[in-house]
Swiss-Prot record:
Keywords: Disulfide bond, Fimbrium, Lectin, Signal, Virulence. It holds the Pfam family Fim-adh_lectin. GO terms for molecular function: carbohydrate binding. SUPFAM superfamilies: Bacterial adhesins. Residues 1-22 form the signal peptide. The keyword DNA-binding does not apply. This is F17e-G fimbrial adhesin. Residues 298-307 have a biased composition (Polar residues).
Length: 343
């Protein structure tokens, strides 16, 4: 009788200890701060290289490996959502607005920053596909990290951002797992910080107003529509800080909306059937006119130098062109402005 009892007890214990149930509990905090408080970050960049991402060299973020305790085959993934307004994009990733001058790039995911998902838009999205714990106890964590973005310059070169709510991450049970009444969503706020912004630029060595005397020609030198003759030339020279790439835009001062490659003649001109084109250096394609703006990516903006040149220059050639409307001799006057963008 005694031996039978011992065998029965051993079998009962074996069966008992192999029974497990998927379970989850919340062990984190519902409200979390991203980044150290009252931090100050400093960077130097070309004046018009905007938007400019402040890569501080380390992660401004929050990570916690122990937010939910899971066991018994529980399956969990993560979804993330950003509540800030989308004010632009960079390489397919949303730029979220903090102030008129400062934005954020945001990543959300599991505990490891390097696996974070670049956030876009304002809808919930999968930021961690998930996993299923075995017959043991483990934890599920999360992380959020950000990079500030300068959107526009200000006169003080300093930008202050107050504490701001960013968004949320929620735990997503799957494969039959259920969270029940367990807290599934945690929220994040960005701690206040200051950006100290030093910009580099160039100085124009050429006079800001350049008069190009146009050579006198005869109508016979432009017999057909599209024919061209060199009328004059000039150069633009600058002195630049190291690392600045210069871009430029020519604008038709008489017709600012002109986006063609033929400069509008002023009202003082008496010749008809002829226009002016401008070429740079040895290019065979004329420059097109664009808006009077230094903004990066401005329409018909063209590259004048690379970041390795500290004394860049460009030679401009002005050519008469037969516009195909029948040439009547007279005076030819045109005004173009040039706007530099320091990127």
């Amino acid at each position: 009788m005694t031996n039978f009892y011992k065998v029965f007890l051993a079998v009962f214990i074996l069966v008992c200890c192999n029974i497990s149930h998927a379970a989850v509990s919340f062990i984190g905090s519902t409200e979390n701060d991203v980044g150290p408080s009252q931090s100050s970050y400093s960077r130097t960049h070309a004046m018009d290289n905007l938007p400019f991402v402040y890569n501080t060299g380390y992660n401004i973020g929050y990570q916690n490996a122990n937010v939910w305790r899971i066991s018994g085959g529980f399956c969990v993934g993560l979804d993330g959502k950003v509540d800030l307004p989308v004010v632009g994009s960079l390489d397919g990733q949303s730029i979220y607005g903090l102030t008129e001058e400062v934005g954020l790039l945001i990543w959300m995911g599991d505990t490891n920053y390097s696996r974070g998902t670049a956030m876009s838009g304002n809808s919930w999205e999968n930021v961690f596909s998930g996993w299923c714990v075995g017959n043991y106890v483990s934890t599920q964590g999360l992380s959020v990290h950000v990079r500030p973005v300068i959107l526009k310059r200000n006169s003080s070169a300093q930008y202050s951002v107050q504490k701001t709510s960013i968004g949320s991450i929620r735990m997503r049970p799957y494969n039959g797992s259920s969270a029940g009444s367990v807290q599934t969503t945690v929220n994040f706020s960005l701690n206040p910080f200051t950006l100290n912004d030093t910009v580099t630029s160039c100085r124009l060595l050429t006079p800001s107003a350049v008069n190009v005397s146009l050579a006198a020609i005869s109508a016979g030198q432009l017999p057909s529509s599209g024919d061209e003759v060199v009328a004059g030339t000039t150069s633009l020279k600058l002195q630049c800080d190291a690392g600045v790439t210069v871009w430029a835009t020519l604008t038709d001062a008489t017709t600012p909306s002109n986006r063609s490659d033929i400069l509008t003649l002023t009202g003082a001109s008496t010749a008809t059937g002829v226009g002016l084109r401008i070429y740079k250096n040895t290019d065979s394609t004329p420059l097109k006119f664009g808006p009077d703006s230094p903004v990066k990516g401005n329409e018909n903006q063209w590259q004048l130098s690379t970041g390795t040149e500290t004394s860049p220059s460009v030679r401009l050639y002005v050519k008469y062109v037969n516009t195909g409307e029948g040439i009547n001799p007279g005076t030819v006057n045109g005004i173009s402005t040039f706007t530099f963008s320091y990127q």
